[in-house]
Amino acid sequence: EIWLVNHILQQASEDLLPAIWSAKYDASDEKTSLADSFDGLGTIIKSAKDAGEIAAGKGNVVSTGKFTRADIGTQLLNMWRHMPERFRMMNSKLYLPFAMGDLYDDWFADEHPNVHSPKQSPDETGQQFLYGTNGKVEIVRCSGMPENSSFAMLTLQQNVAYGMDKPSDMRTLKAVPADYKFKALGKYVFGTQIATLRSELFCTNGQNVNPLDV
């Protein structure tokens, strides 16, 4: 019984990770999956774009088009250089799909085959930083985005938030007495948010997390 409870909790945690970007809240009775229970970061960004809160005119979009092996490093560096000087003096995070992280590695290998400077080479460091930023921009590879997504988001770590009612909610499952069957009940209250979309602290490249979203 203890093993089964732990297994269920582990599965719930694994299901939550990819949903952080792709989840879309739906209150319909037939929508009961984790991906229907809250708005993920990608959904929040898409809604803000539709509302005009994320736009080139607002200064928080640097259009890159679809990334390629030949240009991804240059395009990402352009995003960072677009930001105000005060932002560039701070440590920031660059959120990418896993596949785009791999594409960046390929670009780096092509452009800088003999560079092994600290905080620069993907093969030399435990943390990967965007080349040309002097270690100011850490690349964060994110689960839950489609492989063909060219999405990129640059901001401060503290600007991206998630929260739950109590952290213990995701670690608590109560068994319910029942004959011949194992039943258990659990609950969670979870949500994601971007604190501000102001161009001084936030920038995206105009691509949706899910390329099929229009």
Task: Give names to the regions the model predicted.
Residues 70-107, 118:
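C-terminal interaction module
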Residues 12-19, 99-111:
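Charged, low-complexity, helix-prone segments enriched in Lys/Glu/Asp/Gln
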Residues 36-70, 102-214:
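Sequence/fold signature of self-assembling virion shell proteins
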Residues 1-78:
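Alpha-helical scaffold segments that mediate packing/assembly in large oligomeric complexes
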Residues 2, 90, 178-182:
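Residues at beta-strand starts and edge strands
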Residues 18-28, 88-92, 119-122:
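Short glycine-rich, low-complexity/disordered patches
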Residues 8, 94-97, 139, 184:
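Short low-polarity hydrophobic stretches
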